[in-house]
A protein has these predicted regions:
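General beta-strand structural signal in soluble alpha/beta enzymes
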Residues: 39, 87-89, 139-140, 185-187
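Residues that cap or flank secondary-structure elements
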Residues: 16-17, 68, 117-118, 166, ...
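An N-terminally biased module of ancient metal coordination in phosphate/nucleic-acid-related enzymes
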Residues: 1-89, 94-96, 153, 195-196
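Short, charged beta->alpha transition segments
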Residues: 90-91, 123-126, 140-148
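Glycine-rich tight-turn/loop motif centered on a GG-T
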Residues: 58-63, 110-116, 161
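Binuclear metal-dependent hydrolase catalytic cores centered on His/Asp/Glu-rich metal-binding motifs
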Residues: 100-134
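Surface-exposed amphipathic alpha-helices with a cationic face
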Residues: 4, 30, 77-81, 122-138, ...
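Charged catalytic cores and adjacent phosphate/nucleic-acid-binding surfaces used
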Residues: 1-7, 11, 21-27, 48, ...
């Protein structure tokens, strides 16, 4: 398996807790040998309000919020154009119902634009719509402090490696949990800042060039997740 794909990455233009710019992210992932990069910026009340650093200055209209959110994704796509790095869409949803983060893959912009209640809807309704549309629903860093682990039957899988150097994600426990309940295992760098080095993702026999292809590969198990069960050296956020 020789193609490397990042599944968890944020950029400063959208995620309120990120400081790594889209341009830096693209160049860093090319430098470190990745073929595909999923941008999974936070979709949360903080994204569209006052967080650590307010970036959204629009109104309450959902389409206005989505314009802001997807402008960030399109910026990464434009920067990576002709640079031999596939840029694909994922979303890290922060649900108002439980405060947890969730990674969603396999869906397009229209799905999110057509679901203005996604932040407040009961989680079972969100998962149902994701699955009906052909997507997958994962819990990242499920054993990090303040996170509430969800019932395995609700999830397609979990992150068994989260590479954020500012948090103890207890990847060893996550790996054992995934084994115990037969969950798909993800690996992601959880890139936020320039002092982070890409350290997560999956290896595949072919390059991943579409969101739907990722879903097929994950369901088939035809991938190798990087650093499963290992913990990065924790420094600071």
């Amino acid at each position: 398996m020789s193609y490397k794909t990042e599944l968890h990455c944020h950029t400063a233009e959208v995620s309120d807790c990120a400081t790594a710019s889209a341009e830096w992210v693209v160049n860093k992932y090319i430098e470190t040998g990745y073929d595909t990069l999923f941008i999974t910026n936070h979709m949360s009340r903080h994204t569209f309000g006052i967080g650590k650093q307010q970036k959204y200055h629009g109104g309450e209209n959902w389409n206005e919020k989505m314009d802001f959110y997807f402008e960030g994704f399109r910026l990464v796509t434009e920067i990576a154009k002709d640079k031999n790095l596939n840029i694909l869409l994922g979303v890290e949803l922060n649900s108002n119902t439980d405060g947890n983060d969730y990674l969603i893959y396999g869906l397009d912009e229209e799905f999110y634009r057509s679901f203005p209640d996604i932040l407040d809807a009961p989680l079972k309704d969100v998962i149902g719509k994701v699955h009906k549309a052909g997507g997958l629903f994962f819990q990242p860093h499920p054993f990090r402090n303040s996170i509430k682990i969800k019932k395995p039957a609700m999830l397609d899988g979990i992150e068994a490696f989260n590479g954020h150097i500012g948090h103890d994600s207890r990847n060893d426990i996550a790996n054992m949990w995934a084994d115990k309940y037969g969950l798909m295992k993800l690996s992601g760098s959880d890139m936020h800042h320039e002092k982070h080095t890409p350290n997560g993702g999956i290896l595949t026999d072919m390059p991943i060039t579409s969101e739907k292809q990722l879903v097929e590969i994950l369901k088939s198990g035809s991938y190798t997740p990087l650093h499963i069960g290992e913990d990065p050296v924790i420094t600071q956020n």
